[in-house]
Amino acid sequence: MSFVTTIRDYAETLNSISDSLGQNFTVRSFILETIVYIFTTCRSCLFYILSFQWIHDFTLLPIVLPEFSSALFREKFFLETPSKVFFDFLEISDLQQNKFLLGFFNSFFLSLPFSVIHILSLRRLLIQGRPAGVYTIGGYLIGQLVFLTCVVFGIRQVLVPWLTLEPFNYLLGIILLFRVIYSMTRENLIELKGWSNPRYTNFFLVSFVLAWCEQTSCFQYLGNITLSSNVTILESFSSTSSISTFFTHTSYLLGIAIGSVLFSLFWGWVFLQVKNLCIFYTPLFTSSFLQFFNKTSFVLALALSLTSIPFYSFEYLVTGPLGFVSQDSVFKNTLLDQTLIKDPGKGLTGLSSLERNFQYLDVDVSPFDRGEYLTVPEVPQNLSFEELNYRGEFDWTLRNLKVSGITDSRSGFFTLSKLFKKENKKSLDSQKQLSSQEISERNPLLSELPLVFRVDLATHYDILNRYRQFYDGNVEESDSDPLLQRPIETISDSSFPSSGEAPQPRVENTIESKIKNKYYSNPVYKNLLALDIDLFLKRQPKTFQVNADQEIDLYTKRKMLEYYTNSLNSYSQLPYFETFDSFFDGAKTFSNKVYNQQFKGTLRSVRRLFTVRNDFVSSSEKLESKTEKVLKFDQPLYQFAEKQPFSPYHEELAQKPEQVLPRAKIGGISFVNTPLYAGWDEHLRKFVITNKLLPRTFAGYKVKIEPQTLKNFTNYSVKQTTKIKFTRWPLSEEKLQLSKQDSSVPYVTLFKILDEKTKETFAENKYLSFPANFELVEFSESQNEKGTTEKLKKPTLVPNRGGFVWPGNSKFKLPLLSN
């Protein structure tokens, strides 16, 4: 198997080089590349033997052999290795792969003197002497290093029992801290002499245990800062073998250990110099300085210890140890429900008695994964972040809530639901246009589009009717038990509530404009708001910004890819596919649709000020006009730098002219923009859509779209009425027999017969344009059926998926080898 793999790789290498060089692939290049391949193969074999990787592979044979067998039955001639696909593919080089330096610099964040144990260590260093400080910080560093070792190497025998004690280990740390602080208040402010004091053992052990407990800090999220591409310092690194894994993580931990010691010594030296400067250059005596620092350290230690308590939720500290999960439904509509908040202004405002009976405001305080976002306009929504924090929005929201409450009290509809929720304000007139003065006074970063525009979503009643038609239509028509109808009716009413149960208050758009214009025309408020938004947007790296044209280009090609992949899904063969596609508008799962990870919440206020959608272009003419940039938190760049033009995150975009293969070098073959097949390329590790006319080097790196096709597709994507259908390649013989005008499926072939005379001349070469895996298989039928043995030739496509089974390659481009 290894010999066949070597020959296969050699043939693949020559094919790749021949595709890249084209006519420049000479005999000299062939000999040179052959020598390089032989040298690289010998080096890999020598490393494989000396690194004892063959022992590791031999021990995995009982696991690998069943995978080989099952892969043959599934016709998947490669092993699924998710770790290699998901971790190695996007792994970025960390400090030139020097894990020792990476650990050394990451230790700087672990050594910052902001935690309680660092403050106590500095207190013992400056008051009780250097030995006391060394033993205290030494126990903490060793305990921290042991904990990191257990996490990085995955020593579950130690970690799992300890982590199952949460939150008792956190409470143990709090108790130890208060005990240490209490004992320090009763100590004399004298320096301990020598390095063999028996109290040093207590200092070391207490610090070691505190390193394993929760450490409070001024910046709770500072521990996640790392110079690598990993999420935290505790992340491990991928390696090719067990020996490489051991040495890689050992060097990383060694760098953390040495860096922690050096940076801790540095901070100790800095505070000793500060002590000397305060004593020699200030009127403070030594005793006064020690008393001042002693009191300050106690206050800081107590403050940091108490700040960790509200950092954790009540369920983590109390309900979690009792067996309740996060956001347990048992606590719904109780005092422990996190989605309800008391009205802080109850009893302090001039509202009526009926309004004061509203116990809770309609404020979105639900966790990030439990909120209701992107609902239709008629569904009542919670107050967003912008409506509560920006003064211009909050004043209008507060007035609208008062008007809504007074109107509800006059209507006489007093139900139990009003005790918990208020009706939201009525939707504003989406067709209203602002004056040019209001637009000119906004932030330059804001969109110049109308401040209010309608989002192209299905209306409330269309969704309700469609839901009842497809889901509970059969139940309503049947004479089943009402108990069976009640759950479905409950789901329908809760998912699509009607807005006509109570009269809605009348909202005057002119009053809203006056209230908001009072703030947005104020230069102080306008500059502060613009500064807040600009500082937020400037937190992103400038080298990763994209312009508006690139946003539209990305969105258009993503929509085309979405339609193409939806046409290849298995449910397209269902008998009721048209109904399925009409109801779900394509794929059923949200992950198969085009979306931007850009916000948390509804952004009802921000949508009026920024452009947050890419599909706002309603005509092809707007593509040629000036477009606005989309507000989003991730700004992926096409290309990283001039020296590194390729970006693995958006390889589908058109590259620079000098990086695109000229048309003349392809031998006069015209490009066919319609993709013929799509699939995962195991060698390039990416999803490739190509038509077999591009060389392998450029396959998947360029998606060229004609201007007319782009305009037509833009109109289709906006209207959402015309679906672009694709079909798989190859087409059936029945489809090919029909002309392009008579065929219901548009198609483009790799070759075109000019006339009947040409068809007769080239009849024997009709299979030359098929791919390399096309074969003519000879078989013989039995004599019982035909009476004579007759050999026939039928075309077939053999599996060509790469991996461990090699189906062969096409002919080399080198004339010496192709002959």
Curated annotation (Swiss-Prot):
GO cellular component, one term: chloroplast membrane
Record-annotated membrane-spanning stretches: 45-65, 100-120, 135-155, 158-178, 252-272, 298-318
Main location: plastid
Protein's membrane topology: Multi-pass membrane protein
Keyword terms: Chloroplast, Membrane, Plastid, Transmembrane, Transmembrane helix
Key word Chloroplast present: yes
Subcellular location, record wording: Plastid, Chloroplast membrane
Domain of life: Eukaryota
Coiled coil: none
Family: Belongs to the ycf78 family.
Record protein name field: Uncharacterized membrane protein ycf78
Organism: Chlorella vulgaris
